[in-house]
């Protein structure tokens, strides 16, 4: 959630993937959290703790407002403000940020990604059995996906 390249992917590449491959039923997307710092962990907890119908919209706001909230003097207050924009009360956001089971699950997801797939940085992608590290421009990403769907 604090990775600039992840925000760029989410903003510039993900909508194209959804339109061309996911909406047509050719591919399925699965997001796994891989927080690299405490604020990424907390932002992921807020998103994962939100009602399922708000998850995608909350991710959208977190990535679009990333520079603003990650550079805020009070990052926790900035996260709560984003939560409010997504319809979550400050108390609800606070509960997500203190939910040990949720935080542990996200941290374990990161460890699993590292252990099972060798993921050590963000963004990283698994396309079939191929691991891609780092941001790729749309033409390169599109070529990989086109090859994967045959």
Task: State where each predicted segment sits.
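Structural alpha/beta surface segment adjacent to cysteine/selenocysteine redox centers
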Residues: 2-84
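C-terminal cap of thioredoxin/glutaredoxin-like
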Residues: 14, 81-150
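Short pre-active-site segment immediately N-terminal to redox-active cysteine/selenocysteine motifs
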Residues: 1-2, 121
């Amino acid at each position: 959630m604090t990775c600039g390249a992840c925000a760029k992917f989410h903003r510039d590449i993900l909508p194209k993937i959804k339109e061309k491959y996911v909406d047509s039923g050719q591919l399925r997307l699965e997001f796994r959290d891989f927080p690299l710092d405490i604020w990424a962990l907390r932002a992921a907890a807020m998103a994962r703790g939100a009602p399922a119908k708000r998850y995608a919209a909350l991710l959208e706001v977190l990535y679009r407002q990333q520079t603003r909230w990650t550079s805020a003097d009070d990052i926790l207050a900035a996260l709560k403000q984003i939560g409010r924009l997504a319809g979550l009360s400050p108390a609800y956001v606070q509960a997500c940020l203190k939910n040990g089971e949720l935080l542990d699950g996200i941290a374990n997801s990161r460890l699993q990604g590292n252990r099972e797939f060798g993921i050590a940085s963000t963004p990283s992608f698994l396309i079939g059995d191929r691991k891609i590290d780092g941001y790729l421009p749309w033409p390169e990403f599109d070529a990989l996906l086109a090859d994967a769907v045959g």
